[in-house]
Amino acid sequence: MPYEEQLKQKQKQVNKLLKPYCNTEKIIGMENPFHYRNKVHAVFGHRKDGTVISGIYQQGTHFIVPVDECLIEDKRADAIIRDIRDLLKSFKIKTYNEDTGYGLFRHVLVRTGHHSGQVMVVLVLGSPILPSNNNFVKALRKLHPEITTIILNVNNQKTSMILGEKETVLYGKGYIEDELCGHIFRISSKSFYQVNTAQTEKLYTKAIELAGLTGKERVIDAYCGIGTIGLIAS
């Protein structure tokens, strides 16, 4: 469905729900609704013939639907994930099997800075030991010199959660920074940060404008992620 048609359908739904209570304004859409997502996750596995695959789970199963690229994901993230598949084969690293609990390599999480261009790669393993980790990191950085930090995250639990508690920084600072509405934010692997930077800036700007703040308000920034709304509004 074309993006403009999607907006029309959303507008109809919003009008239907809110018409009894208030007037509605026109939805503010994106100028370019492609490759905007700054957080990309891929689960790793293998086919019966041993071919390494990555993608997303089919709903309600542990069956991996292979994904090479997605129209809403940052192109750099998709390219990094594809190349990691090849590196696993080269380094003979086994992927994790959710059903049996055997294997090592589980997920990859890539976070990108919309304005800064910084790139974080998180390798999620079932064990704290990545074979030949120095050479693996060098090989990945050679393929993608745009990467600013690489993190090894350990998740050895049988869970649908992607990230575990323990992390080791393999390269870089262990975080990236990005700008949102003129403010610089530090983003870690586990930070809650809006995935669509362009629309987030439009949303926050409009919300703050409509709030009519005087500077005398006191804000309780509960459930705030990394505090973007409160900090920008202040």
List where the protein language model places each region:
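Accessory RNA-recognition modules of RNA-modification enzymes
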Residues: 1-234
